[in-house]
């Protein structure tokens, strides 16, 4: 399976399970969205270091999580790279450039918009107030 097919398959699986996750999780109205690119060195660095810890965290268990990570970084903000259900979030992003970007969406509205590897810690701090 090539990388693009794998990416689309994982996105489809994430969206397909969204309804089930919403009823099982404590804060279904909170989403975290990672925006990156497979050809983005800072994104690869985040994936290697912070991503595994994020997936193992208690916070991860309490949110809906989505990844927008096309093969080419320049496509990260293209509408076709986003699942249809998340396109209203894309419309809210004020500056559609720069990665890695971390969004927190609460009640269909972006409440945290952090850019860069160093901003991941700010994202986690922001997230805590929506999970309490």
Regions found by a protein language model. Name each.
Residues 59-83:
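Thiol-based oxidoreductase modules, predominantly thioredoxin-like and allied folds used
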Residues 1, 18-33:
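C-terminal segment of N-terminal export signals and the immediately downstream linker at the start
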Residues 36-39:
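Short pre-active-site segment immediately N-terminal to redox-active cysteine/selenocysteine motifs
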Residues 43-58:
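Typically the conserved alpha-helix immediately C-terminal to a functionally engaged Cys/Sec
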Residues 99-112:
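A short, hydrophobic beta-strand/beta-hairpin element that forms part of a small beta-sheet core
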Residues 1-12:
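N-terminal secretory signal peptides and thylakoid transit peptides that target proteins
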Residues 79-98:
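Short, internal strand/loop/helix patches
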Residues 117-132:
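Thiol-/selenol-based redox modules, centered on thioredoxin-like
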């Amino acid at each position: 399976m090539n990388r693009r097919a794998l990416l689309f398959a994982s996105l489809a699986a994430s969206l397909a399970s969204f309804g089930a996750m919403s009823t099982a999780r404590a804060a279904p109205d909170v989403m975290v969205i990672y925006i990156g690119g497979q050809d983005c060195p800072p994104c690869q660095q985040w994936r290697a270091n912070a991503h595994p810890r994020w997936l193992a965290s208690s916070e991860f268990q309490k949110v809906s999580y989505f990844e927008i990570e096309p093969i080419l970084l320049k496509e990260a903000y293209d509408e076709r790279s986003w699942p249809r259900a998340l396109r209203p979030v894309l419309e809210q992003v004020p500056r559609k450039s720069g990665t890695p970007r971390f969004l927190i969406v609460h009640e269909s509205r972006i409440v945290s918009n952090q850019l860069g590897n160093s901003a991941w810690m700010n994202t986690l701090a922001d997230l805590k107030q929506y999970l309490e």
